[in-house]
């Protein structure tokens, strides 16, 4: 792990099963933890405005991306892998009319993009709960964020399985 990607504990009070989050994701969780519910929603909307544009090669090419059907709004994602570094670049497409979905995607992008496979795979499934959004966002929308994280992890595992025979041979 590089200095700027050191893992930080991201535990909730009384959380005995605290898992370590990558530093950049822990910072986002900490930002949310310091806010009241209404402010958390405002921060989520702020994140939605910060979702990076898709690279040109993916614009108008959603067929090259995976749709996360669990999200209430259309959301597509794709990953690019750097096996030499063991890192993944994550790209999302979500319409501006879906600020909650875009906000979740932007959080995952900021917190996970460019990290090592192992760091991403170690992120706990309860990330949406750690953000403390359960009072501000419906459970269905929170499941969408969990689904995004799940797809990212599944894609990394599939990539590792596909590239393992090539690396062994």
Language-model segments: which ranges?
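Amphipathic alpha-helical interface surfaces
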Residues: 40, 73, 100-105, 116, ...
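C-terminal binding/interaction regions
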Residues: 96, 118-123, 127-169
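Extended low-complexity intrinsically disordered regions
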Residues: 18-65
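A general alpha-helix detector
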Residues: 27-28, 103-107
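Structural motif
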Residues: 34-37, 95-100, 140
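Globin-like tetrapyrrole-binding proteins
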Residues: 2-10, 15-18, 146, 153, ...
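Structured beta-strand/loop patches that form or line metal/cofactor-binding pockets in enzymes
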Residues: 58-81
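Conserved interaction-surface patches within small, structured recognition/assembly domains
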Residues: 80-99, 109-113
């Amino acid at each position: 792990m590089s200095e700027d990607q050191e893992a930080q504990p991201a535990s909730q009070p009384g959380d005995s099963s605290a898992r370590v989050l990558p530093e950049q994701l822990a910072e986002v969780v900490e930002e949310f933890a310091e806010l009241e519910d209404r402010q958390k929603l405002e921060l989520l909307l702020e994140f939605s405005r910060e979702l990076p544009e898709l690279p040109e090669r993916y614009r108008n090419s959603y067929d090259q991306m995976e749709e996360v059907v669990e999200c209430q709004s259309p959301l597509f994602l794709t990953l690019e892998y750097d096996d030499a570094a063991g890192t993944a670049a994550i790209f999302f497409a979500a319409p501006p009319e879906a600020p909650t979905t875009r906000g979740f995607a932007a959080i995952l992008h900021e917190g996970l993009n460019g990290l090592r496979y192992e760091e991403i795979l170690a992120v706990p499934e309860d990330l949406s709960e750690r953000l403390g959004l359960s009072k501000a966002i419906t459970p269905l929308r929170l499941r969408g964020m969990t689904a995004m994280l799940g797809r990212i992890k599944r894609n990394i595992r599939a990539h590792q399985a596909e590239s393992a025979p090539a690396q062994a041979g």
